[in-house]
Amino acid sequence: KDKQIKRKQEEKRMSLFIEEEGNIKLDFDTEEIAALVIDAALELADCPYEAEINLLLTENAQIHEMNLEQRGIDRPTDVLSFPMIEYEEPGDFSVIDEESAEAFNPESGELMLGDIVISKEKVLSQAEEYGHLPKREYAFLIAHSMLHLFGYDHMVDEERVVMEAKQKEIMEKVGIFR
């Protein structure tokens, strides 16, 4: 398993910037799991670019504030996704061309996909609620959010079914099961 993770990091499809707030700690390597899931998502989406993703691990109070500010929903949530790209069709990277300078980091040349914010408290409580490990819940939330960064949504049943199938595919690829 460790060899698989090292190989993935050497192939490096992305830069991952992680910031952590608060006192709650998750008892696994959050960076390693995030990199593994993000890499699998990029591969399955057939992303033609090296990508940049920002990940903020926070607590309920902070994500509650962001959820209210960004979505008008007055409660904490498990994950928020802030895509940088507007796709015509989910996962269709053809809307981006080399001329779309604002889509790429001028220093690294990487495609700036967007930001993911995860509540560590929700990772722990939902893992307990659903009867699986926090590592699995965290990986699932990263997979879910990556699909939002690719333009997928789950507001209507048809989109939800597609998104759920893709989430399952990502989770199977990284080998993290319920």
Task: Give the label of every model feature segment.
Residues 1-139, 147-178:
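An acidic/histidine-cluster motif and surrounding catalytic segment
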